[in-house]
Amino acid sequence: MFVRLWNATLRIQASPAAEAIFVRHDTPIVVALWHNRLFIIGDLGRRYRPDWPLHALISASKDGAWAVAFFELLGLNAVRGSSSNFGREAIYALTDVLRRGDDIGLTPDGPRGPRYAVKPGATLVARRARAPILVFGAAFEAAWKLRGWDAFRLPKPFSRVRLHGRYIEADDLESGEAGAEQLREALLALNPDVEIDPTRLECVV
């Protein structure tokens, strides 16, 4: 509840083009975002995709229990599996979620980094399920940067957050390391690493 109240103070903005991207309803999608943008992901689902439950991968170990509670606060459903090495079990579990018609959210640089280094898990799942990847971006007017490997962004109450997005269709997604680099470049383009006037960054369609 506290997280939702915090989010309610934020001035979330998105261009009409970005909103049209977010509300796409012809297929379940893979939402890809940097680990340090996780705080804002629940707002995407509540505002634009309320009929598409969003699932995220969490470690099956005992250490994953705290993450389940945190993800529930963000409005995410937990899929238990090996999030460290993105093993076969995790790929199958996430593919099943997409095939039954729900969305999944993945942080390609999580759960332990390095920051902004893309692992191939997101592209593997998207290619296997023939699902488009929504490259999700958030630009902050003012945010605290927490200590940690990802420099987690915590937007300050009553500040503006500008949401951005673009799709990489399944047919356009490269395989292996090329696909990982393709996704990394798209994420970097939509997520400025400095605090800016969020309205200056336009949606990339």
Residue ranges and their predicted role:
Residues 1-8, 48, 73, 77, ...:
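Non-catalytic C-terminal accessory region of glycerolipid acyltransferases
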Residues 1-15, 40, 44, 69:
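A transmembrane-helix-recognition feature enriched in membrane-embedded lipid enzymes
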Residues 15-17, 59, 81-84, 166, ...:
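Conserved beta-strand termini and adjacent loop/short-helix elements that scaffold enzyme active sites
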Residues 18-20, 37, 62, 112, ...:
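Residues that cap or initiate secondary-structure elements
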